[in-house]
């Protein structure tokens, strides 16, 4: 029986590979089902012989308790966006300045969810979401329910690969039809449906929704030399690889490819939102390196947003967590990029004045980045006698006078006791990217605030079960879950807390950069503006905003209250030593290193406080030159940049 189970497992996996990867079925559905049922029967009789890569592990479901955090061994970076031919030409010019003979691989930008898959000796070990690029969620059990992801590779490799999980338009339509029949809320678009599916706790639901994937990157070190070779290897290993791509050194040919794909975009079985252009040589990719946010060797061209006409019925003004008052237009409903849109942002008062937007106007509505509906401009030919829009002078929440600073485009409420400002701040603090207090969403925050239980973020950690039980709709079990989530948030790394404080200009990535240097929230109470401005990737605006916040007496009180409540103040990642030999310096590696490999050299430089980049510019402080160094070394000499060799680096 053990031998027969192994035979059936191998045979069915090969049939699945032919069907999903090669798109060339080698057996009829009825024959496949017959063999599959035989395997199920044998495994039920002899469960001790069930193999890890058995296709039966794709069927049925498990109720998961939740998703654990997963730190990526290889960070996932965002891509620089481009919206015009000129931006692509500028990218080409930057690359060709370093590598005149560079070629590019243009691939479709799938509108799905980024996933990372790690295999050991050919077996799938971890499937994870992108998260913030450094820490995602372990969704391995759900990943195993996606039929075109192999549980076992065709070779016993230890490898980490990247790709996109998506939902086809056909599956999306079927799911929404079923949800409509069941009286359930329909998904807005395939991407939202895929995102919701990957975070399902019931793996049987994941299996039914028929997600699919396209893989495009080997994140771990590879023996391949070119990106197109990587795609070929991924296909050979059993992954689904998108068949549409263009290899060329010509930006004209890439532009023609983009226009061809854009024209047939609606004919594809899945959603795409652009084309990604990558330097094809992996060695050149390594030389070009990364900025803080994105690789220098790739760029994502985003398709122009779909546009529709709609009438503005009214305008709502809402207060955000920093006091900014944002206008939102209520519209006659229109279908836009697969969703019904009835509200769109008007950005700010300067935008309203510039575009002369009035209630009753017919306007052009589009989705900014295919996500946020926005008003582009007014169709003046359809304007009648609409009056100029009245701009509020008082805060719609607290009634205090609004201010319009000369250097800002927005109205702002500066009353620190404004109810909306406080509520939005509390919501932000509890949000996933900040303290990630599961369940503490806007509705419950509003109830807590109106009941007088919370007035600032520190109050969250003083809440009791009795407080929650007094709220309408909160039962004992829900109260226990909320308290558990609040308690769990105390152990977050400090960059989550810093971001959660809602300081202007301090996003999640900036928070991490700051705490890599300072290590502790308490240290920011005495941090100097000029010191913060020296941190690579920041600058004077961020430094000023941070110091102004922590110079307030209320900030010291808040930090003390949070610390007393047991909230972690320490950064759990690797701290940068501000006294390190190369702290704050921008360094470029070039040429062949004889004693260290490039990753070892980069790790050492970063441990010494340096930022390692891929190109030489006026901002470069130091170049480490190995043998056969080329254009980067010559450019460094012409700019008068300090140059050292590998021996010098090894001795530090």
From Swiss-Prot:
Domain BRCT residues, every copy: 577-652
Lineage: superkingdom: Bacteria
Catalytic activity: NAD(+) + (deoxyribonucleotide)n-3'-hydroxyl + 5'-phospho-(deoxyribonucleotide)m = (deoxyribonucleotide)n+m + AMP + beta-nicotinamide D-nucleotide
Keyword entries, A-Z: DNA damage, DNA repair, DNA replication, Ligase, Magnesium, Manganese, Metal-binding, NAD, Zinc
EC number in record: 6.5.1.2
Keyword Metal-binding attached: yes
GO cellular component terms, A-Z: cytosol
Molecular function GO terms recorded: DNA binding; DNA ligase (NAD+) activity; metal ion binding
Cofactors that this protein relies on: Mg(2+); Mn(2+)
Positions with a binding annotation for NAD(+): 29-33, 78-79, 107, 130, 164, 278, 302
BP term (GO), one: DNA replication
Catalytic residues, chain numbering: 109
Enzymatic class: ligase
PROSITE patterns registered for this protein in UniProt: BRCT, DNA_LIGASE_N1, DNA_LIGASE_N2
Function (record text): DNA ligase that catalyzes the formation of phosphodiester linkages between 5'-phosphoryl and 3'-hydroxyl groups in double-stranded DNA using NAD as a coenzyme and as the energy source for the reaction. It is essential for DNA replication and repair of damaged DNA.
Recorded family membership: Belongs to the NAD-dependent DNA ligase family. LigA subfamily.
Protein name per UniProt: DNA ligase
Gene: ligA
